[in-house]
Amino acid sequence: MNKLSSHVLVGENQETNFIYLMNIYTGCSVKVSRRIFKDVESIENNDEIMAFLDSEGFCKNTANLIQEVYDEESKQLNITFLIHENCNFRCTYCYEKFEKNAMEREVIDGVINYIAKRIQDDSRLEHVHLAWFGGEPLLNLKGIEYISENVIRLCEISNLSYSSDITTNGFLLNRRIYEKLTKLQVTNYQITIDGNQEHHDSQRVLKNGKGTYQRIIDNLLDISKNTKDSNLIALRTNVAPDNFESMPKHITKLISLFGEDERFDLNFHNVGNWGDKCIDIIKNNVALELSELTVSLGGKSEGILWNLMPNSYCYAGKKNNFVIGSDGMVYKCTVLLYDERNHIGNLENGKLKIDDKKESLWVADKMTDRCFSCPIGTACLNKKCPALLLSKKVENCLYNHEELNRMLKLMDQQNLFTYTVA
């Protein structure tokens, strides 16, 4: 008789009387009414529903799935470009030193040549993903255009799929540039708005100290009102003790501005000690709490649910993921830019010269025995943050049943379950 695999996350909603089943490996999710099945045991004792769940991968052996995760990882090449390492902002909590500028043309051509060679030589490769980061990437829009056009062409010739995302402060993201990026298949955008205008303008300022809030909001309103596409625009808020109390008003404001546009999603992150600056931080993770508040107010907040998605462990822990600096330095992580352990190599003449020992610090198998019985093991692989494990030697496990159950409820509230049995 089939049993649910250990990689299936089980939750419940006592208020609505539903059982939740989430297949972390495939992303398939099922909500089951307790009027039909009172508990998981009664589900497992029913041949009909178990046959259905088995067909959706809910009964697979977890140990075999781990290898499948790594096999899937080998089919993708992910490159993050520090396309411009300077910035037009000087955020108070930023960890970057802004010692470099636009990516050199020699480096740009070298990366394109590297990608072309990988596509030619690696028969396993099925997908190429490019991420634009900085500094502020839109300070080098021409570089983004040139690389995108060339790599898209390479993928089309070889029949590979392609995708792209950008992390930008939003100040330069007017409608014209947004439409240009969309044509270049940039489909995911992350823009930070740190609370209300007063708070945002106290810490996310231009080089000259002037505020940036209204310009960003105006850009996004223009995009919302005058463009139509299926992109995702994540509005990120960094939360600290000095802006936490103002979050309800901030969230309400963003919902009033963008709540009717399905492309916009509100994300929340605790401000972290990313550099050597003394910054007050909130010790408790408030991201889930604020996501719940957003949904209760009628907004959309799906970003936090990434923790439940397949292959959602950190890019830095993936073998086929590289961060390329503007001068050709190769990193694994975009945060520990000044840590020698993160300087894993250099781009030379269209080839990545990688220090295998340094790279292994990030990509080596870090799973423990209990990872194999953990419901989110196939998504996490104990690599949710390799930098944390590397720097602080702390346990990297993120399993918290109460929080995961709240995430399942958040999925339900946003009608994100794949199937309903009621």
Predicted features along the sequence, with ranges:
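Short glycine-enriched, charge-decorated loop/helix-capping segments at active-site entrances
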Residues: 26, 97-101, 202-210, 391
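Non-cysteine beta-strand/loop elements that form the S-adenosyl-L-methionine
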Residues: 178, 186-197, 263-270
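Flexible mid-to-C-terminal extensions adjoining Fe-S/redox cofactors in radical SAM and related proteins
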Residues: 4-5, 337-422
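A broadly conserved sequence feature marking short terminus-proximal activation segments
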Residues: 43-59, 318-353
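N-terminal [4Fe-4S]-dependent radical SAM core
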Residues: 3-31, 45-80, 123
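Radical SAM enzyme [4Fe-4S]-AdoMet core and its adjacent flexible, acidic
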Residues: 198-319, 323-327
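C-terminal accessory regions of radical SAM enzymes
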Residues: 300-338, 367-387
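Conserved alpha-helical substructure of the radical SAM core
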Residues: 65-179, 187
